[in-house]
């Protein structure tokens, strides 16, 4: 799978069977050209689909390369557009983008250009890709990534002690998501403060006062409805151990409120190896109770970055 950097982090989950794909392990002396020639595919496709620009003749030994063979292609004619080509061939525009990474999610094509409509080898199971992105993400990175997205979380909305929402300037990146029609936007609600750290003082204050929960839910839902968010992603980190049992109750309340509007709720949790794992990141989290309270759980694995 071609790697992308959203300026934050990507979550990828799915099931692929290798027998439906060609995975080539580079041997000493092999190049992109020799490998592509062996399999009868375009070297340009091999480079683009594996992010190998600049490495064509100096591939590291042992590198695994995905070989994709087009089963149907299309040659661009004068006055063709990407949307017209997709419609003519019975695929979505995003499928055209995904099959042709060289487009970078853009519509710039030229007569004589060969585009891939279908590949021989494809995953037999569905997949989903979700990601968090800062609002200052480079437009080019956003455009080339969005056609692959099924979940998208602009990072991040906050709140204060009165349960008022700290706004996020997400209009531009949301407009790009809706332009591609590629996925669902989830409202990311966290306890991240202006100094870049998660505040367990703020989370404890909120969790201790249930009267604030309805205010927070009202404010969150109002913005979700105004901006077209499909769900809520709650991300309270470094919770105090004393909040371990009240947090799932709060999650259950928020889930009920957003479910009433036809939306889903995700909770992001740190990876734990045991229920009693010590550490500030883990002691306030109860997998079982949170799992029962939320629609979905996102188990994160980036604690090595924030510890």
Predicted features by range, described:
Residues 217-246, 296-307:
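Active-site groove signature of glycoside hydrolases
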Residues 161-168, 245-249, 253-307:
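Substrate-binding surface in catalytic domains of secreted glycosidases
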Residues 132, 153-155, 186-190, 233-237, ...:
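A cross-family glycoside hydrolase active-site/sugar-binding cleft signature
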Residues 120-216:
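Glycan-recognition patch characteristic of GH18 chitinases/ENGases
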Residues 17-39, 63-90, 113:
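Primarily a LysM-type cell-wall glycan-binding module
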Residues 76, 80, 167-168, 207-215, ...:
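Soluble non-cytosolic domains of exported or imported proteins
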Residues 56-57, 63-78, 83-84, 104, ...:
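Intrinsically disordered, low-complexity Ser/Thr-rich linker and spacer segments
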Residues 1-20:
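N-terminal amphipathic/basic-hydrophobic helices that include classical n-h-c signal peptides
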């Amino acid at each position: 799978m071609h790697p992308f950097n959203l300026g934050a982090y990507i979550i990828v989950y799915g099931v692929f069977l290798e027998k439906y794909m060609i995975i080539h392990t580079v041997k000493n002396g092999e190049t992109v050209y020799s490998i592509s020639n062996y399999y009868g595919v375009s070297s340009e496709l091999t480079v683009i689909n594996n992010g190998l620009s600049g490495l064509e003749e100096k591939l590291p030994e042992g590198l695994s390369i995905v070989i994709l063979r087009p089963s149907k292609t299309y040659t661009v004619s004068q006055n063709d557009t990407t949307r017209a080509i997709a419609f003519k061939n019975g695929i979505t525009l995003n499928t055209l983008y995904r099959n042709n990474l060289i487009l970078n999610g853009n519509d710039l094509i030229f007569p004589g250009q060969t585009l891939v409509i279908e590949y021989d080898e494809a995953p037999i199971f569905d997949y989903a890709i979700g990601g968090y992105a800062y609002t200052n993400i480079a437009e080019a990175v956003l455009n080339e990534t969005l056609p692959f997205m099924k979940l998208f979380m602009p990072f991040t909305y906050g709140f204060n002690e009165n349960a008022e929402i700290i706004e996020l300037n997400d209009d531009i990146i949301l407009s790009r998501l809706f332009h591609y029609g590629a996925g669902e936007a989830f409202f990311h609600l966290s306890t991240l403060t202006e100094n870049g750290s998660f505040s367990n003082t703020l989370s404890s204050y909120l969790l201790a006062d249930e009267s604030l929960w309805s205010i927070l839910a009202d404010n969150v839902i109002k913005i979700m409805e105004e901006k077209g968010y499909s769900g809520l992603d709650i991300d309270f980190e470094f919770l105090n151990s004393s909040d371990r049992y009240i947090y799932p109750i709060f999650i259950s309340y928020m889930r009920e409120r957003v479910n009433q509007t036809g939306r889903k709720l995700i909770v992001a949790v740190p990876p734990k190896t045991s229920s009693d794992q010590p550490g500030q990141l883990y002691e306030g989290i109860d997998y079982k109770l949170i799992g029962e309270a939320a629609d979905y759980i996102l188990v994160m694995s980036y604690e090595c970055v924030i510890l």
